[in-house]
Amino acid sequence: MTYRRGSQSTTALVGCSLDVPEGGWASLLGPSGCGKSTLLRILSDIVKPTSGKASLGGRSPAQARAERAFALVSQQSVMLPWRKLLANVELGLEVMRTPKAERRRRAEEAIEQVGLAGFERAYPFELSGGMRQRAAIARALTLRPRFLLLDEPFGALDELTRERLNFELLRILTETSATMLLVTHSISEAIILSDTVAVMSARPGRISHVAQIDFGHDRSAAMRDDPRFSAYEAELRHAIGGEPQRHAA
C-alpha cells in the first residue's frame, strides 16, 4: 500500500491483513516508522492510498466515514481552549448538526461514562492531561461508533495515569461493545487492552506476528500477576526483536 505526499510516493505497508471480530479489541505494535499510524490514518480516511485497499466492516474508509461508523482518538486531545468541557465533547455532534437537546444528552452521558461528571464547566487548562484524554474519548463516544480507532491516546501520560486509564478504557469498551484498534508502543498496554496483538515489521510495514491474548473481557490489574502476562510480554518482545523469547518454567 503506497501513499503520496507532495511529489514523493512512499510504500508504507505491504500485505497487512488483520481480521478483528465485531466487538473485539486489537492492537498494533512495532518499531517507530513501521506504518502503524499510517495504517490508522488510512482506515480513518485521512490518507488515501495510491495502491492497495483497506476496509472497515466490509466498507471502504470513505464509506465508513460517510456512515459515521468510526471515531478516531489521537495522542493529542485537541480541545478548543475557549470552550468548556461539555461544549468540547459536544463538538462532533454540533458539526453533524445534531439537535441541541440530543447532543447535550449524549455529551452528558459520555462525560459520565468516562468519569468526568462534575467537570462539565471546566476549561481545558483546568484539566489534567489524563482528564483531557478522557474528554477526547467522551467526544468520540458521543458519535456511537462501531469502530474506535486509537492512535497512542495515552502515550504522553505518566505510567501510573496511563495504566489507570487503560482499565477505565476497558470498562468503557465493555459497556459500548465497540470494536477497537489501538496503535501503541507499549507491550503491557497492548496486552491489557487487546484480544489480538499484531506486531509490524520495519517499513515497509507488514504484520509479522499475531498473538492471541487469552484473558477474556473481564480484566483487572491482577492480570499483571498472572504468569500468562509475563509469557505474552516475552513473546511480543521477541516478535518485535527486543530480546530472545523466554518461556515460563
Model-derived segments and spans:
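The feature captures the beta-strand-to-loop junction immediately N-terminal to the Walker
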Residues: 29-31
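Conserved ABC transporter NBD signature motif
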Residues: 52-62
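A short, flexible loop at the N-terminus of ABC-type nucleotide-binding domains that lies
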Residues: 2-15
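Helix-to-loop junction immediately C-terminal to a conserved catalytic motif
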Residues: 44
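Conserved signature/switch motifs of ABC ATPase nucleotide-binding domains
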Residues: 122-125, 143
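Hydrophobic anchor residue at the start of the ABC signature
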Residues: 137
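Conserved ABC ATPase "signature" region
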Residues: 94, 101-119, 171
